[in-house]
Amino acid sequence: MTASQTTIFEHMSGLARELGAINLGQGFPELPEPPELIAAAQRALGERSNQYPPMRGLPELRGAVAGYYARTQGLELTADNVIVTSGGTEALAASLFALVAPGDEVLLVQPLYDAYLPLVQWAGGVAKVISLVPPQWTLPLEALKVAIGPKTRGIVLNTPNNPVGTMLSRETLEAIGALAEAHDLWVLCDEVWEAMVFDGTPHVSPLAIPSLAQRSVKVGSAGKIFSMTGWKVGWAVAAPELAARIAGRHQFLTFTTPPALQWAAAEGLAMPDTWFAAQRARYRALKARLVSGLEAAGFVVLPASGTWFVTIDLAASGLPADDVVLSERLVREAKVASIPVSAFYAERPETGFLRLCFTKDEAVLDKAVARLAAFRARLG
């Protein structure tokens, strides 16, 4: 993607607005936002400073991030490990600008979030791409090993994976750790969906793997954890020396993040585990509702552990395996917007899968399923 290109998310959302379609494409919730977070932000706006906060982030939020990961993932961190950024994407950018030198090769795993490739390129790096193997979307470790060359300096990972929702196991991360140690590689892991896991699969961060802990960067997002994507509050977590390098790039990107939102995120991360469990249960029920409706209509939905998305296998569903063409037809003819999974590929795309977002009201999901079922019936 060039800097002037429109992303597939903006394209499909624009079509949805223009055509009055249900938007199951772009990943944002259409549900009531957490009142606790709104109230915390309002208090902070009225009672606390609205001037520049510290460049690395408010100490309270950095400490809250460390405490949250200690509680939920058993990571031993302090505020010195945390750099607050304006969203997870800025954390990715600051990290890659800190880690990549011109000519460095960086391994990317596709399907991938669309920011990875341009950020590597803007840092002067050269991307080498490894593909997950559908329909289980497994990471081929042998292909990863073969891709490592004398110019390889790092690997970008994503768990849970957007768009397909699969997760990297501890065993897989340990194997990656052995490769990283052998070749002196850094690992940048996009973990923004870590709180959105619905089947009991444990989320494992590279920071929890001894061979990776000192050479990895973890990217997180308050927008995803609290389902408030417009807040754009994120963070990078790394060993102090790595964190300092990332901070050096962050200061020339956004410098800092709105303080009221940082205060609110800090309060949110300290909420009891029951709050987070209730949020997951709500989304788990919405996912089950969409999946059961799609399956009843004859669509084959692939298993996924996390994220806000489900993936339809087009060929297995008896549909034409051209996801770009089908997604355009769906938004225009069925009035339901989706995202073609091929849009998440840098090269050699898989074209037989569509991504749908389930974080919508039950009635909206039911209406979308009815429209998709009618479209499928018309195809015969």
Give the ranges of each region predicted by the language model:
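Conserved PLP-anchoring active-site segment centered on the Schiff-base-forming lysine
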Residues: 98-120
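Active-site PLP attachment segment
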Residues: 209-245, 257
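PLP-dependent enzyme catalytic core of the Aspartate aminotransferase-like
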Residues: 67, 329-338, 344-380
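Active-site phosphate-binding strand-loop segment of PLP-dependent enzymes
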Residues: 132-201
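Conserved glycine-rich beta-strand-loop-beta hairpin in the small C-terminal domain of fold type I
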Residues: 266, 281-291, 301-314
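Structural signature of PLP-dependent enzymes
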Residues: 245-250, 268-293, 319-320
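Helix C-cap/helix->beta junction micro-motif
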Residues: 19, 123, 182-183, 297, ...
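N-terminal small-domain helix-loop-helix segment of the aminotransferase-like
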Residues: 2-87, 94, 143, 270-271, ...
